[in-house]
Amino acid sequence: GELDDDDDMEDDDGFVEEDEKENCHRELARPAATAYVSAPVVVAKGPKPQGPFQVNSTKVNPDTVGAQKRRFLCYNTLGSVVATEDTNSGLKNVEMSFHDTSKGGRMPTITDDVGYELGVCGEKGVLLAAKSQIFFKPYESWTKDSEWTLEMSEDERPTTIACGDDFVAVATSQNFLRVFTSYGAQKEVLNFEGPIVSLAASNDALAVCYREHFSECKLKFKVLDVEKRVEKYAGNIPLSSLNSDEDDNS
């Protein structure tokens, strides 16, 4: 309702009384605090973009009992690659074994001096990667002379790897896709429009999953024929939308 007495109205017009002008001349040049109100800034919070990951790998089980920590670097239809660490001595090893024991069963243990974070077993051998190093160990000749190691620059590290029949592929933090022969010769260096998320390989085919742009969550894929050096398929990866109710209850 209306006020009957103007004297009851609080003086909030932004001006200084006449008898205060001399002492408060600076206040006159400044509007009242309530003269302008900034609109709240609303920042839309979207989903976090998918980072790189290695297919068929696991993390160390935090509930591991005993002195040895184990994690699968790879578990596929061919076999498994397991990284182990003795918590007492700090000794690290990598073990590879076939599901079909007629192919050789368990391979000799690989001493891990660099801390391998990625691993995959292919038709010709085992590919391991850590920091700025990749290491390939073939099955046919499980000797030191048959293996090879490649050192990349310190600012480029492997993020996901794959093994085909006669090639190995390494995606790196510099957004490069490097393809090598099983003997260690580099065949291709490709660059994608967005970060590579994961790789998978079979026979001569290499599947690449990547983000459309660096800040985007949209995922795309390409399937490359490494032997013929052609792109066989390409498209978008369908993803379900986030469910806010499930997110709130999680």
Put a short name on every predicted segment.
Residues 2-140:
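Acidic and/or Ser/Thr-rich intrinsically disordered tails and linkers
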Residues 71-90, 117-131, 159-162, 166-171, ...:
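Short beta-strand elements that form the blades of beta-propeller/WD-repeat-like
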Residues 108-119, 151-162, 189-203, 208-209, ...:
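Canonical WD40 repeat/beta-propeller blade segments in eukaryotic WD-repeat proteins
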Residues 55, 78-83, 165-168, 172, ...:
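A broad "ordered helical/assembly scaffold" signature
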Residues 93-111, 133-153, 174-190, 216-243:
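Surface-exposed loop/turn elements that mediate protein-protein interactions on large endomembrane-trafficking
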